[in-house]
Each structure stands twice: as structure tokens, then as C-alpha cells.
From Swiss-Prot:
The lineage of its organism: Eukaryota, Viridiplantae, Streptophyta, Embryophyta, Tracheophyta. It is a multi-pass membrane protein. It is found in: Lipid droplet; Membrane. Coiled coil: none annotated. The keyword Transmembrane applies. PANTHER family: OLEOSIN (PTHR33203), OLEOSIN 18.2 KDA (PTHR33203:SF63). Homodimer. Forms oligomers. Keywords: Acetylation, Allergen, Lipid droplet, Membrane, Transmembrane, Transmembrane helix. Residues 156-176 are annotated as: Disordered. This is Oleosin Ara h 14.0102. One of its GO terms (biological process) is response to freezing. It comes from the Eukaryota. The chain crosses the membrane at residues 61-81, 87-107.
Amino acid sequence: MATATDRAPHQVQVHTPTTQRVDVQRRGYDVSGGGVKTFLPDRGPSTSQIIAVLVGVPTGGTLLLLSGLSLLGTIIGLAIATPVFTFFSPVIVPAVVTIGLAVIGILTAGACGLTGLMSLSWMINFIRQVHGTTVPDQLDSAKRRMADMADYVGQKTKDAGQEIQTKAQDVKRSSS
């Protein structure tokens, strides 16, 4: 009678509609007798995987060491500071409360200022939409008004200059 190690592996041929041929070997048992070999990959890790491990392990180890030292320093600092905090708590607690309230007040003032600016911006945009004017239209209108004002001032200056010249000639004639 034949045993499981005497049998050859079964071959299966799969034909796909794209006429590609794929050979699949069913691996139930290894003919050479090593059952563990069927679970190992046929090829080793790629170069990028090796580089990732070579870079990642020392980096991760260093970061783990630093986090451990940080934890140790925190525990030592807490062990030293706890009696000091307990002794000075009548002074420290009111100071912390005062500083906390001051920080909360500053943050609240900033939030109110920011809310005010946002409200002002919303009102300006709302008024612009109601009047139907946009910034470029307003700039063009302002340019036209400035040009008109410059023409008006220029004309008034000419008129004033002519009036002064006329008065000067009148004074010159009357004195002669």
C-alpha cells in the first residue's frame, strides 16, 4: 500500500479566457521529507526590506531608549518635587489658580476680538451684497471721483490764478 510520502504532488492546469496558462502545484507534502519547507517562502527578503530593517531597528531602539529615559526622568522629578509641592501648596495652589485665570482671561479676550472681527467682516460682505457693488467697482468709482476732484481743483486753481493776475493788473493800472 502506498503512503503519503510515496505520492507525487498533483499538477493542476488552469486555463483562463485570456488563454494564459498557469501551473499550480498542490503542496500537501514535501517529497524530500521536510514538512516545514512548504511554509517558507521560495526567495528571501528584497533589498528595500533589508534596508528598512537595518534603518528601522536602530532608529526604533534609539527612540525607545529615549522614551525610557524620559519616563525615568519624569518619575525621579516627580519623586523629588512631590514633597516640595506638598510643603509649598498653600502658596503654589493660589498662584496656579491666578495664572490659570489670567490665561483663560487672555484667551477669552482673544476669542471675543476674533469673533468681533468675523462679525464685522460678515456685516461688510452682507452690505456689499445688498448694494450690489464689488471691490473692483468701488475702486473704479473712487478713481473716477478722484479724477473729477483733481479736475475741479485744477480748474479752481486756474480761476484763482487768473483772478489774482487780473487784480494785479488792476492795481498796476490804478497806481500808474
